[in-house]
Amino acid sequence: MLGWELPPHNSGGLGVACFQMAKALAQNGAEIDFVLPYKASHPEADAFMNVLSATDAPPMVDDQGNYIAMGAYSGNCPLCGSRHCKHARAYTKGLTAATHRYADQIESMVRGGTTTPKIIHAHDWLTMEAGIRAKEATGAPLIVHVHATEFDRAGGHSGNPLIHDIEYFGMQAADRIFAVSQITKDIIVRRYGIPAGKVEVVHNSIDPSELSHTTSQTDTSYHYLHQMKTRGYKIVTGICRLTVQKGLSYLIEAATLALSRNPKLIFVIGGSGEQRNQLVELAADLGISDRVIFTGFVRGARFRELYEVSDMFVMPSISEPFGLTALEAAYYDTAVLLSKTSGVGEVLHNVMRFDYWDTRKLADQIVGISLSPALQSTLVEGIKQEYLRCNWGDVARKMMHQYSRVIANHRRLSKVSRVKEVVNRG
């Protein structure tokens, strides 16, 4: 399995999804070598799979200590050599150079290995070249797992043509493609010209053991928010990377409209990203900076506590292939509001939906929930029944079935190819 990050050295949901997915696969009998482009300790992952390093480079972090997953979430991520990175010299210059280096190391590893993998599973565009070269070196079938396309990361714009090309060739070379939602599958078929029959929708899920409730509000990092809730305020939260793809400027504009009708609202935005300063300035320009809190990147207990204190969770993404945080929010009895371009809406139906650009409708929904305890309760109870049906075990069993089909088909085609060679020689 080829991936670009794993917790605790992750900067977003890709690493979380890969970790939980691999854990469930291991519980269903898969033996996994997970190869990363950096060298670091992963004690939790080591408990159920073999985590390998393709290079001796450490994980990259910015000046605030946040991890940088070069290009995993944005075509404009900081590159090696960026002034924001403490360990820039550990990587070759340029994002494509980093992916080439990773691919070189993967090819060397599989050629020098004592065993041949039964299947190669590559996560997103950064590992696709490595997946192709590993397939060529070993003859093993390749599965490409698309968590997001460049069209998603560009937030409705065309994005980086080089990344489009890498994604296209990776999906062409794949024996099977996993897409995290029907929305993503439709993009793969429509924008990349891939046959629909080659793409399997595999929704993400959640692991409740990773989302245990905190035991006491006295230890929380959010005393202020708890105090404001006792005064009748509602907490509206968005947790994501602060990038154009996530549509947070629309949420802040909707917040202005909502606050004009119900001043007892506090908006909390958790996450880090290149749009942070722009969003802070937008809140100030709109005169609501006293009602919008930016927490920075959150993980662990602070991450869980933020969900717990929230009344509403909003995902205003312009293009969201899945949206794992919405499932997590549902676990914490939070009313969920989703843009219509969020893939998690294929799993969660007891939610409020809106077009990402329709700030007036989003404001209406926020105000409606904030003023109606009955509506909030109905949404929370309805969504609870849906997330209780979600589990990584079912996802893993579906993937194991697909693995078996791909391996069997690969063997059949290899046998046919050998027979043809014999016939041609004769």
Task: Report residues per predicted region.
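Aromatic "clamp/platform" in nucleotide-sugar-dependent glycosyltransferases that forms part
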Residues: 318
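A short helix/loop element that forms part of the nucleotide-sugar donor recognition site in Leloir-type
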Residues: 212-229
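Short alpha-helical donor nucleotide-sugar binding micro-motif in glycosyltransferases
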Residues: 297-298, 305-310
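Conserved acidic donor-binding segment of nucleotide-sugar-dependent glycosyltransferases
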Residues: 351-360, 368-373
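Conserved donor-binding/catalytic core segment of Leloir-type glycosyltransferases
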Residues: 229-246, 252-255
